[in-house]
C-alpha cells in the first residue's frame, strides 16, 4: 500500500521543515497539505491545547499552493492539496496552479477538490449556496482544461504543457454522499474521503465510486483516505493525554455528526448537523460554553474519527481498511494536539515504524457495481 503524509501548513515554517525532513526519511509516496482559511479550534481556547506549544496561532495558515511550490523542490514525492474547493477559487486559476506545480514540483502534483466548508467561506464573504452543483460545474471545466488545455467554449486556453516528466496533475475528490461520489467517478483520478469510520462503510462507498467510473467509461479512481493520527505508547496512554488536555477533545466537535453525539446521549453545542465540519464554524461558538463542555466529550467518540494508539494498534486498524480496498492513506499526524511538543518529538521512531507497516500492507480488490 502507498503512504501519503500531510504537511502542517502553519506558521512558522520550522515545523513544516521538520515534517518534510521526516517524510523524506520515510520515503513516502506523496506529500500533501490542506487548504483552510480558519483553523478548527476556537482561538480563545487554543492556548489550552497542546498544539499551541508548536503552532502559536491556529489560524496562521499558509496558502497551500505556495507551500507546495516551496516544498516541491526539496523532495521527489508529488505534492498535493487536500483539499481546496471551487466555491472560492475559479477553475481556470486552479488549473493553471495545478499545471504550474506539476512542473515546479519534482514529483508532480495532486489536486484535491471538495465541495467547501462553511468556516472557509462564510466568514470571508464567499457564498455557500448550491455547493455540490457549483462543484460539478467547477470539475467539468477543470477536467476539460487539464485534459485539453482549453476552456470548453471560447478562445480561453492555457499555454503550459499538460505533462511534465512526472506525468499529468491528478485530480482527487473528497466525497462521502451520493452526488459527490458520482462526480468522483466521472471526473477524478483519486478518491480522498475523510469522514469514513468503518471498513464496511469504506467498501460500500468505494464500490459506488467504481461503479460511477465504469458507467462513464473511466478507470476506477485510486482509493485514498485522509487519516487523523495521534500516536502514544498505547491507546490507554493516548486516553490519558486527552484527559490531561481536555480542550483537545473539541476536535470531535468539528468531526462528529449529530447522529454520533446522539449515540452517546450528548447534545452538541455546535448545533444539529449531520455534516459536522462542513457546517460548523468554531469561531462563532461561545468559548465559555465550549470550555465547560470539552471534558464531557467521550474518548471513544474521538477514537471513531481518529486513528490513535501505538504503531501496532494503528496499523491493525488501517489493515482493516486495506482489506476494504484502501490503496493510499494520507496521514496527518496530530500527536501534538493532545500531547504537546514533548509527545510530538518523542514519536519520531513510532512514525517510522507505522510507515513501514503501512507500506507492507496489501490492498484487497473490491469489485465495482455498475451505475446508470
PLM-predicted stretches and their roles:
Residues 32-62, 85, 117, 122, ...:
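Glycine-rich, proline-tolerant flexible connector loops at the mouths of alpha/beta enzymes
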Residues 12-23, 94-97, 174-183, 311-320:
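Short, acidic/polar
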Residues 3-7, 31-33, 79-82, 109-113, ...:
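Hydrophobic faces of well-ordered beta-strands that scaffold small-molecule active sites
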Residues 128-162, 202-320, 362-372:
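An alpha-helical appendage that flanks or caps ligand/catalytic pockets
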Residues 49-80, 141, 347-364:
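Alpha-helix-loop-beta-strand connector modules within alpha/beta enzyme cores
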Residues 1-74, 169, 368-372:
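N-terminal beta1-alpha1-beta2 module of alpha/beta enzyme domains
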Residues 27, 35, 71, 101, ...:
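Conserved, mostly hydrophobic/aromatic
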Residues 3-14, 82-92, 166-176, 229-232, ...:
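Active-site mouth loops of central-metabolism enzymes
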Amino acid at each position: 500500500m502507498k503512504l501519503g503524509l500531510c504537511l502542517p501548513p502553519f506558521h512558522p515554517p520550522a515545523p513544516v521543515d521538520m515534517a518534510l525532513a521526516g517524510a523524506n526519511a520515510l520515503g513516502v509516496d506523496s506529500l500533501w497539505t490542506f487548504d483552510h482559511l480558519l483553523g478548527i479550534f476556537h482561538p480563545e481556547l487554543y492556548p489550552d491545547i497542546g498544539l499551541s506549544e508548536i503552532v502559536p496561532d491556529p489560524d496562521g495558515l499558509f496558502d497551500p499552493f505556495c507551500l507546495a511550490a516551496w516544498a516541491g523542490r526539496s523532495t521527489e514525492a508529488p505534492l498535493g492539496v487536500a483539499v481546496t474547493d471551487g466555491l472560492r477559487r475559479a477553475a481556470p486559476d486552479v488549473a493553471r496552479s495545478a499545471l504550474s506545480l506539476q512542473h515546479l514540483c519534482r514529483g508532480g502534483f495532486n489536486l484535491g477538490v471538495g465541495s467547501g466548508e462553511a468556516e472557509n467561506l462564510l466568514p470571508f464573504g464567499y457564498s455557500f449556496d448550491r455547493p455540490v452543483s457549483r462543484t460539478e460545474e467547477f470539475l467539468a471545466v477543470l477536467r476539460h482544461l487539464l485534459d485539453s488545455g482549453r476552456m470548453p467554449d471560447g478562445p480561453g486556453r492555457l499555454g503550459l504543457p499538460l505533462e511534465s516528466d512526472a506525468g499529468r496533475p491528478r485530480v482527487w475528490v473528497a466525497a462521502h454522499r451520493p452526488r459527490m461520489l458520482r462526480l468522483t467517478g466521472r471526473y477524478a483520478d483519486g478518491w480522498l474521503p475523510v469522514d469514513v469510520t468503518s471498513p464496511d462503510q469504506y467498501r460500500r462507498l468505494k464500490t459506488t465510486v467504481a461503479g460511477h467510473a465504469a458507467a462513464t467509461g473511466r478507470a476506477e479512481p485510486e482509493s485514498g483516505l485522509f487519516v487523523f493520527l495521534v500516536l502514544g505508547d498505547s491507546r490507554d496512554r493516548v486516553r490519558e493525554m486527552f484527559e490531561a488536555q481536555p480542550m483537545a477533545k473539541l476536535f470531535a466537535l468539528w468531526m462528529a455528526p449529530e447522529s454520533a453525539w446522539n449515540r452517546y446521549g450528548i447534545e452538541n453545542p455546535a448545533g444539529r448537523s449531520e455534516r459536522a465540519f462542513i457546517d460548523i464554524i468554531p469561531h462563532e461558538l461561545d468559548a465559555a460554553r465550549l470550555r465547560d463542555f470539552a471534558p464531557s466529550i467521550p474518548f471513544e467518540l474521538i477514537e471513531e474519527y481518529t486513528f490513535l494508539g501505538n504503531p501496532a494498534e494503528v496499523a491493525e486498524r488501517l489493515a482493516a481498511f486495506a482489506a476494504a480496498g484502501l490503496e493510499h492513506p494520507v496521514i496527518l499526524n496530530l500527536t501534538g494536539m493532545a500531547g504537546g511538543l514533548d509527545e510530538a518529538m518523542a514519536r519520531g521512531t513510532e512514525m517510522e515504524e507505522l510507515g513501514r507497516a503501512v507500506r507492507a500492507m496489501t490492498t484487497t480488490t473490491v469489485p465495482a457495481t455498475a451505475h446508470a
